[in-house]
Curated annotation (Swiss-Prot):
SUPFAM superfamilies: RING/U-box (SSF57850). This is RING finger protein 224. It comes from Mus musculus (Mouse). It comes from the Eukaryota. A zinc finger (RING-type) spans 23-70. Pfam families: zf-RING_UBOX. PANTHER family: RING FINGER PROTEIN 224. The gene is Rnf224.
Amino acid sequence: MLQPEGLYALEEGTALTASRNDCIICYSAYDLSVHLPRRLYCGHTFCQACMQRLDMPAHEQHWIPCPQCRQSTPVPRGGVTMLDLDLAAFLAVKAEREPSKIEPRSSVPLKISTTITQQPAGLYPTLGPQPHFPQPGCCCWGWGRLCWYPPGNPEV
């Protein structure tokens, strides 16, 4: 059956499109070891394994031509592993791989009609006893000598 060229291209394009967390060359999902997402100077991102295959020596300088736009990126002295990570893709992969570190909330639900007057226990550490600083007394010499000391002061 013949299909319109635009529709076929659209269906084919959607079938071949990689997700944001996949390398568009090898279609492998980015990971935290071999397939780290590395960014070229042009801004396109590919996995580290594919970048190493694209590394080509030319005139004693190593260059990586971008498979999408053909802009060449010089390879740093440490090799492909020294290229910048695509931070957004890296953090997305890291978030998928690591278990959630959020502490579970208490299983006791708050009633809507309950008035909250204190912080829930365990949210903030207690500071312990607070230091007591002596408060100076006050003397005024205007209409006569008027002195007072704060309550609990031993000078009274």
